Regions:
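Short, solvent-exposed loop/turn and secondary-structure capping segments
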Residues: 2, 8, 47-49, 138, ...
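N-terminal glycine-rich phosphate/pyrophosphate-binding loop and immediately adjacent elements
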Residues: 2-39, 188-189
Length: 192
């Protein structure tokens, strides 16, 4: 995923964005709703505080990079009203400063290291690689599994409890629509 190729910047986003999602009817998605989950999963270099967690799977470190020119840019930004921000994860990430990063000991930390590798020992998890999900298997209004192609062959995986769809911002809705989940006018236009 992107945590293996991105810039390693750790930034949660604006509290106002989360609150906006809640105001649009997405209960449980406000800043105060999601903050406990950030705290639970975080292992912050400074330890646990009201805004940061300790002991979680997601390693968050201070940047080891300090260049005089970056400090000069931060000072110059003040002249334009862009004030220093000591913590970009306090719910308001407007300003200038140094981002915290997803690293452990100066080495990239990604979701595979933090979440997947520890879970691979679970008896109810099977990792399938070199496969492409084609559609969701529905049982009435419930998603009961997935159809995927691997090595030119079509396979099915069925879930006893739940299916967690995490195919990204583009492929998650694509898979839902290919499976008949979505706005009827869009689905009809696609011949689904």
């Amino acid at each position: 995923g992107c945590t293996s190729v991105n810039g390693m910047i750790y930034m949660r986003g604006q509290a106002a964005d989360y609150d906006g999602w809640r105001q649009m009817g997405n209960a449980g998605w406000g800043w105060d709703d999601v903050l406990p989950y950030f705290l639970k999963s975080e292992d912050h270099h400074a330890g646990g505080t009201a805004l940061h967690g300790a002991g979680g799977e997601w390693k968050v470190s201070r940047q080891r990079l300090k260049w005089d020119i970056l400090l000069a840019v931060q000072e110059g930004a003040k002249e334009f009203g862009i004030m220093p921000r000591p913590d970009f994860n306090d719910g308001d990430n407007e300003g200038s400063g140094f981002f915290e990063v997803n690293q452990k000991g100066g080495i990239r930390w990604n979701t595979a290291k933090g979440f997947l590798k520890p879970a691979l020992k679970r008896p109810n998890l099977r990792l399938v690689t070199h496969a492409l999900t084609e559609s969701l298997i529905l049982d009435g209004k419930r998603v009961a599994g997935v159809r995927y192609r691997q090595g030119g062959r079509l396979h099915e995986a069925h879930a006893d409890a739940e299916v967690l769809l995490a195919a990204g911002a583009i492929n998650s809705p694509k898979l839902m629509e290919l499976s008949g989940i979505g706005r009827p006018d869009v689905l009809k236009g696609l011949g689904i």
